[in-house]
């Protein structure tokens, strides 16, 4: 399947996986950045290694990692792999700019092609939670109608500002 925006529509067709756990393993190539697909090919040919991802935002957010962690655990289970996940903040906690929210350790072959979807799941939920709270705190006596797609808009854009650092390690966290 080619890696383009039109292929994202295919994710919604004929999928038995729950909506919140999409994309499923067979759909990942259509939503994964080409860089990560090529990296997986290279690692596959030269040998796997243990990596640790430290995921953080370049702006303040609220920790809203549960959907991303649920998705990651389901994908890892489907692939019959193992990862070590270390959360740095409780769900709903304030997270400062640059503070690691989560560390994920495991096989690079297992994790590398999950990065695009994982970062989108983390970025969207954490920014949306922060923006929603900011609106409520700013306008305490106002009722709100949820326009979910708009919560991530603003100065930083929908997913801009999410960064992931990957360390090559020999030990788990």
Where are these regions (language model features)?
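Buried, small/hydrophobic-residue-enriched core segments of structured protein domains
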Residues: 4, 91-95, 102-173
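Flexible, solvent-exposed loop/hinge segments and secondary-structure transition points
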Residues: 2-109, 117, 121
